[in-house]
Amino acid sequence: MNDGPVAPLVTTRHDEDVAVIEFDDGKANALGHDAIEAILSAFDEVEDAGAVVLAGRPERFSAGFDLKVMAAGPDAARGLLRRGVDLFLRMYLYPRPVVAACTGHALAAGAILLMCSDLRIGSRGDYRIGLPEVTIGMSLPVFATELARDRISKRHYTRATALGT
């Protein structure tokens, strides 16, 4: 039974010369293939804007990569990581300012999205931002470590990359 139209994962709007890209999957804002493709398409759609704001849903900026895809096997995980890196690079190298409006929790690849942005602003609340991979003994990919070195103050860098907080 169909419950009606499905809301899009990503919506875009313009507020004068600023484009706003909103990501909302109705849950944790996990980055699966559909979400990554939708965000990449949204960046294509707003190329004429003077600046771009990327926002998540209330209380959930992004929980990172979709763990169902990551658990589907090494090929599926590699494919998702490759497209994720395409998104990270698109944001990091974007020719105009990208502002992340952190609307809630930003974990793992969600935190990397924040670091790919030129500026980050956050909602007030008891939200977590971090790289939990390192808390379970996983090492960060080199690009994530270098991105953190570029975007996080020295004071917070070690804590973020060694402790995940």
Could you describe each region identified by the protein language model?
Residues 4-5, 90-165:
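Crotonase-fold acyl-CoA enzyme core
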Residues 46-50, 72-75, 94-96:
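Short glycine/proline-enriched coil/turn segments at helix->beta-strand junctions
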Residues 37-38, 56-89, 106, 135:
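Glycine- (often His-adjacent) and acidic-residue-rich active-site loop
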Residues 1-57, 89:
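Conserved CoA-thioester-binding segment of acyl-CoA-metabolizing enzymes
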Residues 21, 54, 66, 113-115:
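Hydrophobic/aromatic residues within transmembrane alpha-helices
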Residues 25-28, 68, 127:
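A short, flexible beta-alpha/helix-coil linker loop
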